[in-house]
Structures are given as structure tokens and as C-alpha cells.
Amino acid sequence: MGTNQRAQIVMDDDEIEEFLRRSRTATLATRGREGSVHLVAMWYALLDGEIWFETKAKSQKAVNIRRDPAVSVMVEDGVTYDRLRGVAVEGTAEIVDDPDSLLRVGISVWERYNGEYTDEMRPFVDQMMHKRVAVRVVPTRVRSWDHAKLGLPDMPVAGSTAAFL
């Protein structure tokens, strides 16, 4: 893709926020002890425009972040080239374990994936967050793409994987 096309497909800040708000799953990359990349699919919270995760305090990703807080997060969508879009965030992860932040992240995750939060849900959210930490991603670089901006004709879903979609 040429330089002009790259500039054409970039999402603005509002488009990025809307895309992240509507999407469901992110891929989180952390670095293992020997430098290997540890990739995991994660549900996430979106708080004040920032991506947050919740995870077990002793999970491999939490161990990796404590050792090396550099992370990458990608959220992507689209099954044909003309509809590919996504956001990739490079940044620093901060482990947060204060009760107010944990509850805020827990409520956001609950609402994104289960439905409206009410006071009756509090025991479920508390249980969900038991022995967990929140992870805040502080971005240092954000890249985005939306191939729909290229104005290509609709492409059919085809190939050996099409039958499984």
C-alpha cells in the first residue's frame, strides 16, 4: 500500500473511539522472560478513552507486565480486504489493584459483555474481580486502518476458509 493510500485509511480519534467501543475482543501482546511474545485474546474495558483489562493477579500476562510493562494491543475486524479495519496500540501497561479502579473496570467489563449493571449485580462483579488486578494501557503510539475508506468495490467472501464464516 502506497503512502497516499496509508494516509487515506487512517481513522481519526472519534472513529478510533467508536471502533473500540463497538468491538468485543482485543489481542494483548506481552513479553515473556526470554523475550518471546505472549499473545492472548482479551475482553476489555474502555474507560475515558483508554483500554483496560482485568486478569488474575498471578496470570502469565500479569507476571510479564510486572517484569516488562511494554505491551501492544490490537483490535481488528473484517473478513474481506475491502472491509479490514483495526486499531493497534503500543504502550506501557500499569497494574492497578486499588478497589475503586477494580470495581470500575469490573463494571465496565460486565456491561460490555453481560448487560446493564445494577446494584444487584455487585456480588457477581465482586466475584469476577476476586484475586484479579486491573491493567491500564497508556498509549505511546496508536495506528489505525479502515479499508472501507479506499472505496473499493465489495469483495465476496471466498477461498478455503469462506465456508467456515
Segments from the language model and where they lie:
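Short beta-strand segments in beta-sandwich/barrel cores
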Residues: 26, 51, 71, 93-94, ...
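Alpha-helix boundary recognition
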Residues: 20-21, 66-67, 129
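Short secondary-structure boundary/capping segments
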Residues: 17-18, 63, 79, 125-127
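A generic local structural motif
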Residues: 12-15, 38-40, 58-60, 121-123
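Short beta-strand segments
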Residues: 23-57, 63-65, 72-77, 85
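Charged, gly/pro-rich active-site loop segments
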Residues: 2-11, 81-165
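Short, basic/aromatic recognition patches
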Residues: 2-27
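Amphipathic alpha-helical interface surfaces
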Residues: 16, 61-64, 102-109
